């Protein structure tokens, strides 16, 4: 890639601005139409600005459709097919693995990094989020990314040996100041939606009053009337200082969860930067969060299978920047389902492109 491209992609002035109000009304832009994909063409002569790699087909489709561009196929019949397109002045390449995990993602990211010479290696997709620090649909930006199951295993236990890959400081600042209001997947909630969020937290054994997402789902001033209404309807009962579900309340939220097969289209999600721990297996164990804290990462926000690989490939191939953005689809608990998977994949792609555009600006 030429020097002119390097200067044009990332400048020192790129930063995000804070705007919008979670309690206000948002004029949401219409969802873009599914993007066109044109026939195979020659490999880009001058490389690309950003290479986006996903692990799953659903994540790939979300990243493809959220870009709002016309894509061009490359090597459609080869071992590593990919698409190219342009968005916000950035030349993009998009590819996917055929299955989850580092062993599938690493060779694709490495091969295309050598061929396309990107200035940023990125990934969008889904992850598990810490149930007390994130809500389903929230978007986590990895900082740092690390492999949590690297280390030494003996008959008496496991000792971690973690290599951390921190996010660029300027990018971290932009993430911390980023406000997702205005993205197609962002929307406020109220009334019955707030009640359902409250009841679902109780159903999962959480304390809604102390949950980090409470101000977004139950705006200031709404709580007293809401709990009074739910209590009057016989859905909750106060025991000591904590609200508990009654049988009627449990039946209502279980019926709602069982009937919600498509998941949400819009949520008041937050964009959070924090540690993302990558492992080699899908986790359905709520004890994972305490174990990760016991290994020394007390503020871990998310668990996935590929973030550390993306950061490692960027480091080893001397790619100037990397960015892993993933939407929370569950809390790594045994009751996990795919209700939020579609939303999480789409929201993460929208946030990824928005962050890239702001950095480009």
Question: Language model features by range: what are they?
Answer:
Residues 31-323, 327-361:
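Intrinsic-disorder/coil detector with helix-boundary
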